[in-house]
Amino acid sequence: MARYMEALTVERGGFRIKVPESWWEFDVRPESRDDSIHRMVNERLRAHPELAPHRDTYVSFLRKAAADAWKSGALYCGCMAESFGGATPITGSVTVSLVGGRTSKGDPLPTDPEAVTAQLAVKEARREGDSWRKVTTVDIPGVGPAARTYGIEDVPVPGDELGRTIRAVLMQTFVPVPGQEGKVALVAGSSQVLDLAESFFDIFDAITSTFRFAD
């Protein structure tokens, strides 16, 4: 899956991030996302007719990714849905959210990477096939240090009243927001293609490394 394309810089209020040019990027608002998705899929299939058999898969995946991003409060959602010669496209997504929290006394939670990592739990897999999570810090060029988790995790389904989860490759990077006490930009990459976990970790790391706050 080591097929890298030209990067497309996407700008949103307060930040910018680069994703591969072949990725899908669209408005996640409910009133406009369906039209946006159908328009993009039609344009992509006109340019690449060989992808036509996967049309329904693309539309279904993109609609679900957009809905989940909206429910989770994401400001940005970029999606990968690539056909590498297999029967089903390989899918993944990256979202950016602005999150924050307060202590029981009402004080803003610290956003220093070391303080954030101290609050994040490592999870070891007890047996093959179990979920797991590692916690570390990374340095984002032009931004600075940030806390990060990555692993195979059971992710809650946004808005699901039954509390169901989906097992996924997940990387989350917590970037302190300059001048906003207690706020971090959460850059999250996920995919349900567990067999390609290491490849997705590389992709999510590469995309996150392009994150910048707008001047």
Residue ranges and their predicted role:
Residues M1-R167, M171-D215:
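N-terminal targeting sequences that direct proteins away from the cytosol to non-cytosolic compartments
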